[in-house]
């Protein structure tokens, strides 16, 4: 179940606010400039769909984002527990970083924990199937895919080169709860 938990960035032990309610989550995230919404598809993707199948199922929604925001490229990332790079990628994604562009992700299946460091608070957003999140450019954040990741996501980019991170060097991510599934 999707969820939002908000902490102070000085106290990882006591959540200040928490909700599983979609409208409340959207309201809190919109207040800090984060887009959060649900997408639907009427296509059955089947087990382990390839990237072309995933893109085709959501092409209309992708086209709307491109028209609205001018994004230039998109791709599909799939991660499974047997991926030999999962530990390396998890370590990289868990390091607090920013991007020079919005980080736009749509969860086709599975789940991931986006953690945003904004205005003295940590916003932990558990995104699941059909959740779209767009983190504004320059927002310090990290992503936890869990120890045994199992997800497929569409990534949308301003920059045709794809995912380019600027690591902050802050170890704050180590202090906050991780994704447990």
From Swiss-Prot:
Sites marked May play a role in metal incorporation in vivo: 96
Gene Ontology molecular function terms on file: acireductone dioxygenase (Ni2+-requiring) activity; acireductone dioxygenase [iron(II)-requiring] activity; iron ion binding; nickel cation binding
Pathway per the UniProt entry: Amino-acid biosynthesis; L-methionine biosynthesis via salvage pathway; L-methionine from S-methyl-5-thio-alpha-D-ribose 1-phosphate: step 5/6
Keyword check for Nucleotide-binding: no
Site (May play a role in transmitting local conformational changes): 102
InterPro entries: ARD, ARD_bac, RmlC-like_jellyroll, RmlC_Cupin_sf
Its EC number(s): 1.13.11.54, 1.13.11.53
Keyword Protein transport recorded: no
Catalytically driven reaction(s): 1,2-dihydroxy-5-(methylsulfanyl)pent-1-en-3-one + O2 = 3-(methylsulfanyl)propanoate + CO + formate + 2 H(+); 1,2-dihydroxy-5-(methylsulfanyl)pent-1-en-3-one + O2 = 4-methylsulfanyl-2-oxobutanoate + formate + 2 H(+)
SUPFAM superfamilies tied to this protein: RmlC-like cupins (SSF51182)
Protein residues bound to Ni(2+): 97, 99, 103, 141
Binding positions (Fe(2+)): 97, 99, 103, 141
Keywords: Amino-acid biosynthesis, Dioxygenase, Iron, Metal-binding, Methionine biosynthesis, Nickel, Oxidoreductase
GO terms of biological process kind: L-methionine salvage from methylthioadenosine; L-methionine salvage from S-adenosylmethionine
Cofactors that this protein relies on: Fe(2+); Ni(2+)
Site (Important to generate the dianion): residue numbering on this chain: 105
Pfam families noted in UniProt: ARD
Coiled coil: none
Entry's cofactor comment: Binds 1 Fe(2+) cation per monomer. Binds 1 nickel ion per monomer.
Subunit-structure text: Monomer.
PANTHER family according to UniProt: ACIREDUCTONE DIOXYGENASE
Similarity section: Belongs to the acireductone dioxygenase (ARD) family.
Biological role stated in the UniProt entry: Catalyzes 2 different reactions between oxygen and the acireductone 1,2-dihydroxy-3-keto-5-methylthiopentene (DHK-MTPene) depending upon the metal bound in the active site. Fe-containing acireductone dioxygenase (Fe-ARD) produces formate and 2-keto-4-methylthiobutyrate (KMTB), the alpha-ketoacid precursor of methionine in the methionine recycle pathway. Ni-containing acireductone dioxygenase (Ni-ARD) produces methylthiopropionate, carbon monoxide and formate, and does not lie on the methionine recycle pathway.
Protein name per Swiss-Prot or TrEMBL: Acireductone dioxygenase
Source organism: Sodalis glossinidius (strain morsitans)
Gene: mtnD
């Amino acid at each position: 179940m999707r969820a939002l938990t908000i902490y102070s960035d000085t106290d990882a032990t006591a959540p200040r606010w928490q909700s599983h309610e979609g409208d409340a989550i959207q309201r809190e995230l919109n207040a800090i400039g984060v887009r959060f919404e649900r997408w639907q598809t009427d296509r059955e993707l089947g087990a382990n769909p390839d990237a072309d199948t995933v893109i085709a199922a959501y092409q209309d929604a992708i086209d709307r984002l491109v028209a609205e925001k001018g994004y230039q490229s998109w791709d599909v990332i799939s991660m499974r527990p047997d991926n030999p790079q999962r530990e390396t990628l998890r370590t990289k994604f868990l390091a607090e970083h920013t991007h020079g562009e919005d980080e736009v992700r749509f969860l086709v299946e599975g789940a991931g924990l986006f953690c945003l460091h904004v205005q003295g608070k940590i916003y932990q957003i558990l995104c699941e199937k059909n959740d779209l999140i767009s983190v504004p450019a320059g927002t310090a954040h990290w992503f936890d895919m869990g120890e045994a990741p199992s997800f497929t996501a569409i990534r949308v980019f301003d920059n045709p080169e794809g995912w380019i991170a600027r690591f902050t060097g802050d170890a704050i991510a180590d202090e906050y709860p991780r994704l447990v599934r």
